[in-house]
Regions:
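Extended catalytic-interface subdomain
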Residues: 242-244
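RNA-binding accessory domains that recognize and position tRNA/RNA substrates
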Residues: 1-238, 253-430
């Protein structure tokens, strides 16, 4: 089923994604496009029912206010504007319309159908993937994160054994994560899964490296090398599956975007290993990816897995990584997650994890002075990850977590709770 679509033209608003999400939540598909799109480009899009010109504070580029092409106003679709002083629309709003006003525009003015939902999306993507891939083979780097897991589940449903998933355990995963990947995809979904335990290889490369950026480069570079080695062992691969999602594309930037981030996923492969990309989640926001995972039947612990940095625990084991500190980090993090789940905080807090600095602190164990590692707990809430506030956790809960960590992870001498918001601090420590 081809979904009806509302096109949002970006004229500098910081609320493009808010508007896009509002429309999708009302059951109509929406996309954000550059302000200078032509009518021909607009009409080439599928099932357009209406256009919204979304202005805002970033409309000035190089000293000049950007404007839409005049032909947009007579493109044949209903057009309204939001926070756009230069608008020539008959219907203009100073701020984002509420749901009732938006419903009137979507369903009475544009005559759009409320046919945007995950059941339709999955059915459409299965059809599109089969059409794109045909009888060829697809390779996917399966990290176990939400995006790659949902892509894998969708591709398994679409093309079955034509997909080969490669899971690289770099030794920096959280407790039992690699085992869960093997269980779900190798055993339950019966996917073609190549499991590579490269723990010794990664930790060997990281030995003595304290600089965070250098650690990231080593982990990223080594991952590409391992993935390349596995890819070369396989024959007939013509496509590369990727977990690209809609925010990745938006963040690639438009002329009005102040913060530009180059879009990439599993990049860095050599020229002779370039594949055609299969990106079935490229239309979805993060929460929609999770909803897609639920529709595909993935287990909740995988679908609602928290954001996790690409270098894994490597950037939470501060400074030069040692196996002992890495184990303290992995075990303390598992305890934190278990207790947050016990108290219902796992559904309330956006992101929470532990960090282990690269120094020891004095403590007392078995009535004797001892030196142990410090564990730092971080728990934050955010809407867009650009700013974040701390979660005010009850002291009784913190005390229980502290007690468990110091009892069960004997290399730890003390536990701290970190209370710095973003800004001034970033969410991650490295």
């Amino acid at each position: 089923m081809k979904q009806d679509m509302i096109v949002i033209l970006d004229l500098g608003s910081t609320e493009n994604t808010v508007l896009a999400r509002q429309i999708r939540d009302l059951g109509v598909y929406s996309e954000i496009h550059p302000h200078d799109i032509t009518v021909d480009e607009l009409k080439a899009l599928n099932n357009v029912k209406g256009v919204i010109l979304n202005g805002g504070e970033n409309r000035i580029v190089d000293g000049v206010a950007v404007e839409v092409n005049d032909e947009i106003y007579t493109c044949g679709y209903p057009v309204i504007s939001v926070d756009y002083p230069g608008s020539k629309c008959e219907v203009q709003y100073a701020e984002l319309p509420n749901d009732e006003v938006m419903k009137d525009f979507l369903f009475n003015v544009c005559k759009a159908e409320a046919n945007w939902n995950m059941k339709n999306f999955v059915a459409d993507q299965i059809e599109l993937v089969r059409k794109q891939v045909g009888d060829k083979k697809v390779l996917l780097a399966l990290s176990g994160g939400v995006d790659s897991s949902v892509v894998a589940a969708l591709l398994v449903k679409a093309i079955g054994k034509q997909l080969t998933c490669v899971h690289v355990n770099h030794g920096l995963m959280r407790k039992n994560e690699s085992e869960n990947v093997v269980e779900v995809f190798g055993n339950q979904l019966n996917a073609n899964l190549v499991y590579v335990d490269a723990t010794d290889r990664f930790l060997g490369k990281l030995e003595g490296v304290a600089d965070p950026e250098e650690k990231r480069k080593i982990i990223g570079g080594e991952f590409i090398r391992v993935f390349e080695e596995e890819a070369r062992k396989l024959e007939g691969i013509e496509f590369l599956g990727q977990g690209t999602i809609y925010p990745d594309i938006i963040e690639s930037g438009t002329k009005t975007a102040k913060c530009v981030k180059s879009h990439h996923n599993v990049g860095g492969l050599p020229e002779d290993l370039q594949f055609e990309l299969v990106e079935p989640l490229a239309q979805l926001f993060k929460d929609e990816v999770r909803a897609c995972g639920v529709e595909l039947g993935l287990p909740a612990e995988m679908v609602y897995r928290q954001p996790f940095p690409g270098p894994g625990l490597g950037v939470r084991c501060l400074g030069a990584i040692t196996r002992e500190r890495l184990e303290a980090l992995r075990e303390s993090d598992a305890i934190l997650r278990e207790e947050f789940a016990n108290y219902g905080l796992d559904k309330k807090v956006w992101q929470y994890f532990t960090v282990v600095p690269d120094f020891k602190a004095v403590g007392v164990r078995n009535h004797e002075r001892s030196m142990g590692y410090m564990v730092v707990i971080r728990a934050v809430n955010t809407i867009d990850a650009m700013t974040a506030s701390i979660e005010r956790i009850d002291y009784d809960i913190l005390e229980k977590i502290c007690q468990r960590i110091t009892d069960e992870v004997t290399s730890v001498s003390r536990v701290c709770y970190e209370i710095t918001p973003k800004p001034v601090a970033t969410i991650e420590f490295e």
